[in-house]
């Protein structure tokens, strides 16, 4: 495919129709269109309102614990013997991941719109926990749709959601993973448009979700940019993040998109390899199609049916990706690469033993890419890896895979 001519800025999208080039848009049921337009109007008003910004900033600081630290991973750096590796510590946020950034922004939007019920989808459970958390904080009922497979492999997070007062509904359709949970959440939303706010957790879905999720998550990259300038006196050579739907990645990437000297790498779930269908590397092995209200790269068969996919990481187990990532791939600004389950598991253990930090399996995919790249770089070069979440939720999964009885 011919790459489009590089734009003057990579940060101007989406357009008024929610398109990033040929990706994005609003492919939704007629009953949802008025709600989507209402949400867009509410968001446009909110983001220009100093009071909204002040309230979000206060919650981010005093409730979520921002700014998150930019930490020099000295043990891992020395072990690999190449570039200096920094971790953006989103795992230290309240609820244990980057998900709280977006949830705080959206719960304030829901309040402005007068919505009285929150629904959400979740894969690894981190977005479900963050949604249940903000719903509890603002006294709203919350229903979380979660694939039955993910309910089984993320039991600690299921309990946390219930403890926070959310109703967790297992979805057994399909493979019982994130795609199926999102399908059910959309069905709920269509049925309950008057009082319900759908708090989407990733940078996908119909416009304006990819834009607003990106904007709420861009605090990651804005902080990291300022922090690396303070600590190293210059911008990084490389930034790396795991990509499922893509919210933590776009949050880190977006503020760096127009810095031509910064190489940007998104890491997809290579699962058990790209030869078969047991992976979730939609940009490495998929093609454009429409799912969950937007046009993007998808895993699909010759008839256009969506494939189920596989990843050891519940949060990367999604057969699509946010539309802005699809555009960034085709424009050539960001490189997207797959990491296998086994490589992520190795990186999970290596990070734990060299840094005393247990990363989420999603983040371990990004660390695995750092393990590959850092030794090929000079010791004077700098890399930032987004540590998007902590690994408490994954210890049972990892223990089982390593043959340990937990």
Swiss-Prot record:
Native organism: Brucella anthropi (strain ATCC 49188 / DSM 6882 / CCUG 24695 / JCM 21032 / LMG 3331 / NBRC 15819 / NCTC 12168 / Alc 37) (Ochrobactrum anthropi)
EC number: 4.2.1.20
Coiled-coil annotated residue ranges, if any: none
Name assigned to this protein: Tryptophan synthase beta chain
PROSITE patterns: TRP_SYNTHASE_BETA
Complex formation: Tetramer of two alpha and two beta chains.
Reactions catalysed, as given in the entry: (1S,2R)-1-C-(indol-3-yl)glycerol 3-phosphate + L-serine = D-glyceraldehyde 3-phosphate + L-tryptophan + H2O
SUPFAM superfamilies: Tryptophan synthase beta subunit-like PLP-dependent enzymes
Protein family: Belongs to the TrpB family.
CDD domains for the chain: Trp-synth_B
UniProtKB keywords: Amino-acid biosynthesis, Aromatic amino acid biosynthesis, Lyase, Pyridoxal phosphate, Tryptophan biosynthesis
Function: The beta subunit is responsible for the synthesis of L-tryptophan from indole and L-serine.
Pathway: Amino-acid biosynthesis; L-tryptophan biosynthesis; L-tryptophan from chorismate: step 5/5
Keyword Iron-sulfur: no
GO CC entries: cytoplasm
Modification N6-(pyridoxal phosphate)lysine occurs at: 99
GO molecular function: tryptophan synthase activity
Transmembrane segments annotated in the record for this chain: none
Cofactor dependence: pyridoxal 5'-phosphate
Superkingdom, taxonomy of origin: Bacteria
